[in-house]
Amino acid sequence: AGEQLPGVINVSARALASHALSIFGDHSDVMACRQTGCAMLCESSVQEVMDLTPVAHLAAIKGKVPFINFFDGFRTSHEIQKIETWDYEDLKDMADMEAIQAFRDHALNPNHPCQRGSAQNPDIFFQAREACNPFYDALPAVVQEYMDKVNEKIGTDYKLFNYYGAEDAEHIIIAMGSVNDTIEETIDYLTAAGKKVGVVKVRLYRPFCAQAL
C-alpha cells in the first residue's frame, strides 16, 4: 500500500483463536488489517463474490490501492450455490488498459531506473505519507464506477452501501457479510407485519465513504 502497488488478497474471513480455536466466520482477522492501507471490499453471497471480485481487481489497478476482498468463512466460502458466471471478454471490456499499461511501466526496469526503499526523517516521512491521501479520497468513486459497469452488464444494483427495507424505517441495522441475506428475509417478514425496519449493507468498508450513506 505504501508504494501504491495494486493487488488483491481474497480472504474468507474467520475468527482469530482466543480462549479456543474457531475456524468459523467472523471478521476478527480482517479487522486486524484495517490500518494497513489496503482498501476493504466485502461480499454477502457467492454471487456477489463472483460479481464484485472483478471490481476489486479493476479498482486496485486504476486507483493504485491494494484491496482485501473478503467474505465470510464457511458461510460463504464453502457454500454450494448456483450462480451466474462471468465471461472473460466481458471483464476485458471493463478493464482500463491505460491504467494497466501504467502499472506495467511502473515495474523495475534498467531503462528507466527509480529509487525505492529510502530512509526518511520525520519532517519528510509524514509529508510523503500524507501525499497518498488523494488516492484514498478518490477510491470510492473508482469503486462505484466499476460497480456501475457491472450493474450495466448484468442488471444488478451494487453500490458502496445498499439499503433494503421500508422507506420510512424507524429502526435500521448496519451490517456486512453473509448475515445480510438473513436480515433481508427478516425485514420482509417484519415489514409485512407493519414494522418500519431496514438494513444498510456495507460493501466498501475501507476507505469508508460517509457521503455515500
Question: What role is predicted for each listed range?
Answer:
Residues 18-24, 51-54, 78-85, 185:
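Short acidic, glycine/serine/threonine-rich loops at helix termini
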Residues 1, 11-18, 46-47, 73-75, ...:
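Acidic, glycine-rich active-site loops and adjacent beta-strand->loop/helix elements
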Residues 2-8, 27-28, 35-38, 62-66, ...:
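Short coil/turn connectors at secondary-structure junctions
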